[in-house]
Amino acid sequence: MMYYIWLHLQFVRKHERALQAEHRIQIMMTQIQPHFLFNTLSAIRALIGKDQKAASHTVGLFSAYLRQNLESLNQAEVIPLSKEIEHTKIYAEIEMIRFPNIRVEYDIRDEECCIPALTIQPLVENAIRHGVRSRKEGIVRVAAYREGNEHLIVIEDNGTGFTELPAKSEDGTHIGIENVRERLEQMCNGTMTIDSKPDEGTRVILRITAGKEVNR
C-alpha cells in the first residue's frame, strides 16, 4: 500500500512540475514578439543589397538574440543581471541598426543581483516601440544600482509617454509587462512601478531586496 501511495505522489509531483514548466513557457512566449522577428529579417534582406558587412553583423546579432531567447524558455531559475543586460544589448543594437534615430545607454553600477530571464529586454523593447521610435532623437537609459538593502533597476525613456496603461493591447504589450511584474514578484519578491507622463517619457523601476531571490 505504501508503495502505491509513493508512486501516486511521484506522479502528482511530476504532473505539477510539467504544468509549471508549461505555464513558464507560455509566459516566456508572450515576451517574444513575432513582429520583431519579421522586421529584423526584412532589415537584413534590405542590408544585403547595400552593405553586406552590416548585414552579416546583424545576422550574427539576430542569431545570438534567438539563441538566448530559446535558452530562456528552459530557464526556471533567476539569472545574473549581467546575462540579462547582455541579452538586452544585443536586442537594442539590432533596433539601433534599424532605427538610427534611437540610442540605448547603460549605467550599470550594481550587478550583484539575479532576476528572471526576459525581464529588462521586454521593457526596453516596449520603450522603443511605444516610446522613442517616433522621436527625432529617442533615448532609452538602463541603470542598475544599490540603494540601501535594495537592488534598483531603472529603465527610462524620453518618449511619448501615456496617462494610463491600457487594460489590453492588440500586440500583447500590456500582457508582456504584467508577465514581467508577475515573475519578478514570484521569483525575486520584487516590485515594479511605472511612472509616465504624456509627451515627456516613461520610467520603470524594478526593486529587489538584497538576498531575497527565491529561485537561485
Region spans (language model):
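Two-component histidine phosphotransfer core
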Residues: 1-32, 36-175, 179-193
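C-terminal beta-strand of the catalytic ATP-binding
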Residues: 206-212
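Short, charged, solvent-exposed linker or helix-capping segments at domain edges/interfaces
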Residues: 214-216
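A short coil/beta-turn micro-motif at the C-terminal edge
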Residues: 146-148, 198-200, 210
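Glycine-rich nucleotide-binding loop
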Residues: 139, 161, 198-205
